């Protein structure tokens, strides 16, 4: 939802504890935080920043002692637009994103940003991205930073979404056991569906053979949709209007059950009510 650095403080001031950015590629090189048209209704689709600059700015907002530091800003999602990449480019993209984060966000392990990171990929066939990403951090001597990283494999959406068993197999191929965030959703101008897929994901998360740590839903901009998503049992909500989520969380029905996550909460641990 946030692709320009000037938008970051606006979302944080409205109550967000996390942000999502769309990362576009030139070949295998992550180049811009940019979505383009069409996008959610009411959203500025053409805001952008250079990838490295965006990461450096995120580091400022999540590094204690920095003048821009925000204690409540604890996580960001990189929506990686790898849909058009071939298998070789996907592997190289994983390498390049790892190097970009290591240098520009984690500051090569020297007092870098402390936020958790979720890497979201649009195709379960792109599991090699994750394998390469992890291997780069290990080779560079920063395997410990993988403790801060989660993964989302959620597509492709056309012609139909993959089964959850297929998603699970992709994570196994990626070498991922835990740290799994799984998303579902619709653009905010689409007619609201019955959330059947979302309910299926939540049920799988809570099952004995569940492989999912957290479930998040997008794009939730209405009070009514927020309430419905909470009733289904999501762990996170992606919105263009953070204050809407804050307002609902403060309602009598929800305030004793839900709250915004803090840095001390484990983003890879499934919440048990």
From Swiss-Prot:
The residues the record assigns to binding Mg(2+) are 20, 22, 79
Listed InterPro entries: PLC-like_Pdiesterase_TIM-brl
Reaction(s) the record says it catalyses: an N-(acyl)-sphingosylphosphocholine = an N-(acyl)-sphingosyl-1,3-cyclic phosphate + choline; an N-(acyl)-sphingosylphosphoethanolamine = an N-(acyl)-sphingosyl-1,3-cyclic phosphate + ethanolamine; a 1-acyl-sn-glycero-3-phosphocholine = a 1-acyl-sn-glycero-2,3-cyclic phosphate + choline; a 1-acyl-sn-glycero-3-phosphoethanolamine = a 1-acyl-sn-glycero-2,3-cyclic phosphate + ethanolamine
Q: Which GO terms describe its biological process?
A: killing of cells of another organism; lipid catabolic process
Q: Name the keywords, alphabetized.
A: Cytolysis, Dermonecrotic toxin, Disulfide bond, Hemolysis, Lipid degradation, Lipid metabolism, Lyase, Magnesium, Metal-binding, Secreted, Toxin
**Which of the seven top EC classes does this enzyme belong to?**
lyase
Provide the Gene Ontology terms for cellular component: extracellular region
The record's cofactor note says: Binds 1 Mg(2+) ion per subunit.
Paired cysteines (S-S)? 39-45
The task this protein performs is described as: Dermonecrotic toxins cleave the phosphodiester linkage between the phosphate and headgroup of certain phospholipids (sphingolipid and lysolipid substrates), forming an alcohol (often choline) and a cyclic phosphate. This toxin acts on sphingomyelin (SM). It may also act on ceramide phosphoethanolamine (CPE), lysophosphatidylcholine (LPC) and lysophosphatidylethanolamine (LPE), but not on lysophosphatidylserine (LPS), and lysophosphatidylglycerol (LPG). It acts by transphosphatidylation, releasing exclusively cyclic phosphate products as second products.
Name this polypeptide is given: Dermonecrotic toxin
* Organism annotation: Loxosceles laeta (South American recluse spider)
């Amino acid at each position: 939802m946030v692709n320009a650095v000037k938008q970051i403080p606006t979302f944080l001031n409205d109550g967000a504890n996390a942000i999502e950015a769309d990362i576009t590629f030139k070949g295998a090189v992550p180049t811009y935080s940019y979505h383009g048209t069409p996008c959610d209704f009411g959203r500025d689709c053409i805001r952008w920043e250079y990838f490295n600059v965006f990461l450096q700015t995120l580091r400022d907002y999540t590094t204690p002692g920095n003048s821009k530091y925000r204690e409540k800003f604890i996580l960001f999602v990189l929506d990686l637009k790898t849909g058009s990449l071939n298998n070789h480019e996907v592997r190289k993209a994983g390498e390049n994103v790892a190097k970009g984060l290591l240098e520009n966000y984690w500051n090569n392990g020297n007092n870098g940003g402390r936020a958790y990171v979720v890497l979201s990929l649009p195709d379960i066939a792109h599991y090699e991205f994750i394998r390469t990403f992890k291997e780069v951090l290990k080779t560079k001597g920063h395997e410990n930073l993988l403790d801060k990283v989660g993964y989302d494999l959620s597509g492709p959406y056309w012609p139909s979404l993959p089964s959850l068993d297929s998603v699970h197999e992709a994570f196994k191929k990626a070498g991922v056991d835990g740290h799994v965030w799984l998303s579902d959703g619709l653009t905010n101008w689409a007619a609201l569906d019955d959330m059947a897929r979302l309910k299926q994901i939540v049920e799988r998360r809570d099952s004995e053979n569940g492989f999912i740590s957290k479930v998040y839903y997008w794009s939730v901009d209405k009070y009514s949709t927020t309430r419905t998503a909470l009733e289904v049992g999501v762990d996170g909500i992606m919105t263009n209007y953070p204050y809407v989520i804050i307002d609902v969380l403060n309602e009598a029905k929800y305030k004793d059950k839900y709250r915004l996550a803090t840095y001390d909460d484990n983003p890879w641990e499934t919440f048990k009510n």
